[in-house]
Each structure stands twice: as structure tokens, then as C-alpha cells.
Swiss-Prot record:
Coiled-coil residue windows: 39-62
Compartment annotation: Cell inner membrane
Subunit structure: Part of a complex composed of FtsB, FtsL and FtsQ.
GO CC term, one of those recorded: cell division site
GO biological process terms, semicolon-separated: FtsZ-dependent cytokinesis
Function: Essential cell division protein. May link together the upstream cell division proteins, which are predominantly cytoplasmic, with the downstream cell division proteins, which are predominantly periplasmic.
UniProt keyword annotation of Cell membrane present: yes
Name of the molecule in the record: Cell division protein FtsB
Amino acid sequence: MGKLTLLLLILLGWLQYSLWLGKNGVHDFVRVKDDVALQEVNNGKLKARNDQLFAEIDDLNGGQEAIEERARNELGMIKPGESFYRLVPDQSRRNASIPSTQNNAQQ
């Protein structure tokens, strides 16, 4: 009876070791679970970006407004007889706010 008990205890110890520390054990399970959660977050961000790009492609294929907007903003083009005004922020206000922000960052 003693040998059977010892054999069962050794078997139990080996199973516990395999469960907690062995290959595909609890440690590996937790690590893979964390990796999957991180990948799902990354996939969500990439899916949102892809959806935005597909919407932009559909807009470019279907409507003239998006093409005109890009031509104005990126190429500086305008329609005949049209006046295009671009408002630029006041440089004196930008320069006045930059040193105060840098002083706050240094303190």
C-alpha cells in the first residue's frame, strides 16, 4: 500500500509541475491570453483606420466635393471666378504663447 501511495504522490507532483510550470501550462495560458487581448486592441485600431480609408475612397469615387477639397487644400487650385481665402493664425499670438508654455514646462 505504501508504494502505491508514493507512486500516486509522485504522479500528482509531476502533474502539478506540468500544470503550473510546464509547456502549455497556466503561465503560458496567461501570457497568450494577454497577447490576444493586446492584438485585439491593435486590430480594432487598424479596422477603424481601414474603415476611414474605405469611406474616403468611396467619397473620392462617388462625389466631386472631396476631389475639389483636396485640390484646394493640397494643390492650391480654385475654380474659375472663385476666390479662396485661407485664414492663418496670428504669429504674434503664437510666439507670445510659446515662451510661457516653455517656462511652465521647465518649472
